[in-house]
């Protein structure tokens, strides 16, 4: 009867094993030791043999220093000390779960249920054939007995041992863990080692004499309530009433390494491998970090998750091909954070440049590719304004222990970054904080973020721009997209004050992680992500929707169905702009197109075409002339204006002869250096001369010349059947 302690790899140490044994046996940590030469066994309750992964229960009368030991059979070990020899039995299985011993399952340590299932459920037949074990397709925490006690909701103070026992058994036997309650988590036996580099650098750069290895970074750890493994499956009945809950406080913290992690996810290889897990229909609340995934999450699924009352809803080293359904982030300080972890000194992301040189894959680059979320709803904590210390503390926490901006300085200049870099790598990602934002995806080492998409999103209070993706200048490969989003209370500092003067983010405050930003950069997306459709509700600081316009690389064709007898003119595509109201900038109508001025090369003048009328005003010898007809028609061809003027008065008396002047032209002419007036003029009183039209430079006034010397035409005095006709072109300034 072998009582093995199954402890997967990945951020697991001897200390962690001892803590796990103490937890499942109900002992103090100092009462559990690894079995090794020279061990003083006096006062110990349990010893652990790492070679056979077995736990042995001492009788309490053993003394002396261990000289040797011999496992007689699967149930017995003989330990020899410098005082005596002792026969010890393996930690016995205790079958307790209900009043009928024949139907009980569970163990005293929560790790050997399989033996009991084999011994008991294999012998209980079902009416439909087979045995009871065949019908057991899931595990619950209530199936386990620890320290002769089973979990009773509302009575048991700490559900962590029962939760972990169920998860461990489910992992071993490929069974899902089903939660039917919100289980309290008081203890945090799991250990997570925070990101750090090992001090090494790519050997080729050392050989070249331009880089060298240095001391590794110090080890820092955090505590977690439960741990999921590769292929772990944990599901509840709904996101409201089933899950786990801690007692961490958003208002008072702690906001440092003493904070807690709810769900720690890690595969066998820790940071240097993939992990695949499945969490559905759960509520995770009351932890500094709701869920933390070590390694690259690949082919994992999450659905109907509510993460509430947490500091950071999730931290992920990276992910690839992950699918999420409905993710509801309810009253937290920061949404999910992906990537951005300092895990190597090398300014590179190719496996050749990553330890152990080469790495089996680029896990330590923390890449993010091809994830899809159906619904992503973020509700900021309306009781905590951005001025609350929780925001700055958690921003600093993530930078201090994950992103580590100070490390981005090259080693030669006092930082930890390699002096060399991979050829063609994009710029390092910049840290812009994580709090007051729905989702943050960082690229730490210049590897592009590719196609991390959301179908539908809802934002209810996000002081910063809700979505941020690192964008490498010059590369927009993998442009991620959000299908549609609804916004409410975005870009404001104090939730209750709304979008008012003094409360506008980036305008009325300085973001400590983006101090040069003096206007709100975007309502929805910053960096290499864009939203395709935006609904703006109340109290949103107005800006562009996306800092970088999303790219549609596949091309598009827009088609509209109409009634076969419909002959009306209608819009097939309209582009509008909002500043104070919606204004149509481009309308592609079924019968015409309304467009802005055309530019045929990037540095050329804008082309406009226009047609209209105006009323010319005539002066002769400085006197205004009353006319019975004054018609002006113009056509605009870019910067060239074509004019037709017709003036009539069949009984006009002119008292004083003098120069001819017509004002009121539709456009101001350009300076004389850019062109002259060209055209013809006719009036019956101009005999023996050829009249020349001239628009005075930088005015809207037409004068009439009678020769090329520039002599003004003087209209004679008298009473006339007056008529005047002019057709001419003149030039106006470019782009006016």
Curated annotation (Swiss-Prot):
* Biological-process GO terms, alphabetical: adhesion receptor-mediated virion attachment to host cell; symbiont entry into host cell via disruption of host cell envelope; symbiont entry into host cell via disruption of host cell glycocalyx
Q: Which Gene3D superfamilies match?
A: 3.30.2020.50
Source domain of life is Viruses
Task: Name a single GO cellular component.
Answer: virus tail
Alphabetically sorted, this entry's keywords are:
Degradation of host capsule during virus entry, Degradation of host cell envelope components during virus entry, Host-virus interaction, Viral attachment to host adhesion receptor, Viral attachment to host cell, Viral tail protein, Virion, Virus entry into host cell
Where does this protein reside within or beyond the cell? Answer: Virion
Q: Does the keyword Transcription apply?
A: no
User: According to its UniProt record, where is this protein mainly located?
Assistant: virion
Q: What job does this protein perform?
A: Functions as a receptor binding protein (RBP) and probably mediates the attachment to the host capsular exopolysaccharides. Displays a depolymerase activity that specifically degrades the KN4-type polysaccharides of Klebsiella pneumoniae capsule.
What's the name of the protein?
Depolymerase, capsule KN4-specific
Which species does this protein come from? Klebsiella phage K64-1
What is this organism's lineage? Viruses, Duplodnaviria, Heunggongvirae, Uroviricota, Caudoviricetes
Q: Which gene encodes it?
A: S1-2
